[in-house]
Amino acid sequence: MKHCPGRLPGEKRKRACMNPLVVIPTYISSRHSVPSDRNDAVVYDHTTPLMSEGELPRCLKSLNRVRGVGAVAVLVAAERGIEQQAAEKVREIASRFPLLSIMVVTAGELDIVRRRFEQLRLGRLEFEIGLSGYSAIRNLGLVLANILGFDSIVFIDDDEVIDDASFLEKGMYGLGKLTRRGIPILAKSGYYLNAEGNCHSLSQDKWYNRYWNQGRAFNQWIDQALAGPRLSRSNHVCGGCLALHKEAFKRLSFDPWIPRGEDLDYLLNLRMYGSDIWFDNKWCLRHLPPKGISEGRRFRQDIFRWLYEFRKMEYSRTQIDLQQVKPSSLEPYPGPFLQPGIEKRIRKTAKLRSIGRPDGKEYRKAAKAVATEASEYARRNCTRYFEFQYVWPEIMVRTEGDSILRNALLRSVVLCSEEGVIEPPAEQMMTASIDAGLTKEVRLNVSE
């Protein structure tokens, strides 16, 4: 591991050592169930059945080989009614990796956080921060990092495999540094490789994708990013290969009202509030998801996502305190999906795919959703994130260094070791010290 050395002559304040919390959400269901259409805000790409091993052990095994890993928080998002069994299942899995300092965060720990919120008169914030919904789960990870004193956070997903022992070192590279123009690098994304070692979208340029060439647009963008300097402003975010500096997550939360695509949405939020996410073309891992929801149902979720995003971006342009983010600044991806006419494109794509793809029934349902539930959802909720943003910095200020909450959490979470399950002392968890690189060298690898 690249430990931070003592300062050399002329290097004052140019080195920074980072202590990231690694956060891994895992989603547990009672069986291979398909969520109801009426609950579009909490549909996951895939869940692990309670009686199945799932992908988490494979992920932790690969993380075991990574240099510099300090604390790992596994957030257990369980279907209602099986929270206790899911917690026991994940604790048993964590116990197989005694070399990792794993905190298993369950409904019990969440209740501790919420009770403290109430004591601090912040409200319980049950929708915005919790163990249900992609963004709420990520927000819980941010809150935990803030409470426990970590200066950064790295999100990975339980269906990923890390092959590079320097994964965290690459993730921390440049984080917290200033570019030549004085712009802080506060958020970074890497990229995914599939089972064949390819980073490109496999979405095909078929006739039924004429109005929805998302894969081609993404491939065009990532080819440009991979060919350029190591760090460049990103138009895309891989939420399972994402590093955030505390100065980013203390200011901005994830948006609990977006059904999926919360990672790209975070990029747009950062831009609206005057910051950015940087793409690191040397930082990657393998994404090996199991079979999840049907492609028609996934497209339905995309409809909710893009209509909501379009409405939200439109609303943001009416706010004088926000930076305007234009679709033209997000070419070739995702700009075209944030332009007027998105509803017509969605309808046409759903109809064409209902003919050309096997999942025709779900695509026909999706086409109907444009004019009904999805449009209404976007209209009803597009302002709520900005209202929550008035509250979020206060949450961060009030919980940072809160010894009562910190100690209560440390007493509650369990750390799995060779001797069994023990309570983790605070000192044992704050062990990572990863060099973010020399400022001068980082600046040579940044495209501005």
Residue ranges, per PLM feature:
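N-proximal low-complexity "stem/linker" segments adjacent to membrane-targeting elements
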Residues: 7-68, 74-78
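Active-site-proximal specificity loops/subdomain of glycosyltransferases
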Residues: 94-144
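Conserved donor-nucleotide/metal-binding helix-loop-beta segment in metal-dependent transferases, i.e.
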Residues: 165-186
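A recurrent flexible, glycine/aromatic-enriched loop bordering the glycosyltransferase active site
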Residues: 223-241
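Acidic donor-binding loop at a coil-to-helix junction in glycosyltransferase catalytic cores
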Residues: 259-266
